[in-house]
């Protein structure tokens, strides 16, 4: 597919998706596309997204409001490797260039859903889940997760890896090590956001 096959409006939608991912690190929802481009209803955005998917410009993943994937990102990851995220500065997207220590070649087809980045683990709070200090956590970028999944959460100015337990607007972030406390989060009050779900781990001994 080349951009020449897109209508001007489809190109505008594709550019908006790319720009949103560059700014925030994740794709927009249908409602966000509507607001950005002045569509009157999410149905209009959905029609353009389905047209872009038919032409191969994007992939639509069912079951999530941000289920828009750019094949060009996957191709870049396959050739360059996945970005390895180290320390994350407050207030900036997790995949901001300043956070990326290096790229590491991974066969992304070994993981499901497809991973988007690697997070360097710090500490032993997830020891009993087999996630150790210095390991690389293989992460699928998403803003939706199920109870029991291991998640990457941004909480205030810190990024943490924990097992998720959610009851409405209240979260419990559970460590897999009895030496670490459970973190209680109230989404109506606390500055918290989901940065992805764990889909695998690369042991520290196998790095470099």
Curated annotation (Swiss-Prot):
Q: Which InterPro entries is this protein grouped with?
A: LexA, LexA-like, LexA/Signal_pep-like_sf, LexA_DNA-bd_dom, LexA_repressor, Peptidase_S24_LexA, Peptidase_S24_S26A/B/C, WH-like_DNA-bd_sf
- SUPFAM superfamilies reported in the protein's UniProt record: LexA/Signal peptidase (SSF51306), Winged helix' DNA-binding domain (SSF46785)
Q: Which Pfam families match?
A: LexA_DNA_bind (PF01726), Peptidase_S24 (PF00717)
Residues at the catalytic site: 125 (for autocatalytic cleavage activity), 162 (for autocatalytic cleavage activity)
Record-given protein name: LexA repressor
Under CDD domains, the record lists: S24_LexA-like
Q: Function of this protein? A: Represses a number of genes involved in the response to DNA damage (SOS response), including recA and lexA. In the presence of single-stranded DNA, RecA interacts with LexA causing an autocatalytic cleavage which disrupts the DNA-binding part of LexA, leading to derepression of the SOS regulon and eventually DNA repair.
Q: What is the lineage of its organism?
A: Bacteria, Pseudomonadati, Pseudomonadota, Gammaproteobacteria, Chromatiales
How it assembles, according to the record, is: Homodimer.
Q: Which UniProt keywords apply?
A: Autocatalytic cleavage, DNA damage, DNA repair, DNA replication, DNA-binding, Hydrolase, Repressor, SOS response, Transcription, Transcription regulation
Q: Which family does it belong to?
A: Belongs to the peptidase S24 family.
DNA-binding region residues: the ranges are 30-50
Entry keyword annotation includes Methyltransferase: no
Give the EC class as a word. Answer: hydrolase
User: Any idea which GO molecular function terms this record carries?
Assistant: DNA binding; serine-type endopeptidase activity
Q: Which reaction does it catalyse?
A: Hydrolysis of Ala-|-Gly bond in repressor LexA
Protein EC: 3.4.21.88
